[in-house]
């Protein structure tokens, strides 16, 4: 076997021995185990829903016997471990992660509000009025007609809108006026076509 292969095997062996030890350093998690009869038991986090809220630590005599949640005094007696000997103790909180969650949540909320304002400004005229009154306005509030429709069909400023052409073979009829609630006079008239019914 080459020295490179032997070295990688040694690194793998050390890693496989240290990895469970690192995972078991967290005293609030009872890892999965196989008992002396060969039955597999799933891991769990202490306290379980059925446990007292003071039972926050995982107690066991060795890795092949029943694991259960216990309190601090029982943990120190069973595991022969002094939890308060460390500089930060066992119940340290990760405040930097909590701060990160709050900052991330703030940015997500900000993006949601900005998205709502943009959607409202594009679709509702009353929102444009209020945003302009509050000093929030700009080019982004003007909707480009070519943006959503077909650019070949979109009328350019200063050009009249193209009139719909009747299909060949039909007789042109007089246009009818379109009545709307707003009183738009810029709408093109609707064309009626003859249809045959059997």
Curated annotation (Swiss-Prot):
The keyword Transmembrane applies. Glycans are attached at residues 52, 94. Residues 157-170 have a biased composition (Pro residues). Keywords: Glycoprotein, Membrane, Signal, Transmembrane, Transmembrane helix. The chain crosses the membrane at residues 97-117. Residues 145-198 are annotated as: Disordered. Pfam families: Shisa_N (PF13908). Residues 25-96 are extracellular. The keyword RNA-binding does not apply. It is a single-pass type I membrane protein. One of its GO terms (cellular component) is membrane. It comes from the Eukaryota. Residues 1-24 form the signal peptide. Residues 118-198 are cytoplasmic. It is found in: Membrane. Its main location: membrane. PANTHER family: PROTEIN SHISA-LIKE-1 (PTHR31395:SF11), SHISA (PTHR31395). Belongs to the shisa family. This is Protein shisa-like-1. It comes from Mus musculus (Mouse). The gene is Shisal1.
């Amino acid at each position: 076997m080459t020295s490179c292969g032997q070295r990688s095997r040694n690194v793998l062996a050390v890693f496989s021995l240290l990895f469970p030890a690192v995972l078991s350093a967290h005293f609030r998690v009872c890892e999965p185990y196989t008992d002396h009869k060969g039955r597999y038991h799933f891991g769990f986090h202490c306290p379980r829903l059925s446990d007292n809220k003071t039972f926050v630590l995982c107690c066991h005599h060795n890795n092949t016997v029943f694991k259960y949640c216990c309190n601090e005094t029982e943990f120190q007696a069973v595991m022969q471990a002094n939890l308060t000997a460390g500089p930060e103790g066992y119940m340290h909180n990760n405040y930097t992660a909590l701060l990160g969650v709050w900052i991330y949540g703030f940015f997500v909320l900000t993006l949601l509000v900005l998205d709502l304002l943009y959607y409202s400004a594009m679709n509702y005229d009353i929102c444009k009025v209020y945003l302009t009154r509050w000093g929030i306005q700009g080019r982004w509030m003007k909707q480009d007609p070519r943006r959503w429709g077909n650019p070949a069909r979109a009328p350019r400023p200063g050009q009249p809108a193209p009139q719909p052409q009747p299909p060949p073979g039909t007789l042109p009829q007089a246009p009818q006026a379109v009545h709307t609630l707003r009183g738009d006079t810029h709408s093109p008239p609707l064309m009626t076509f003859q249809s045959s019914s059997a």
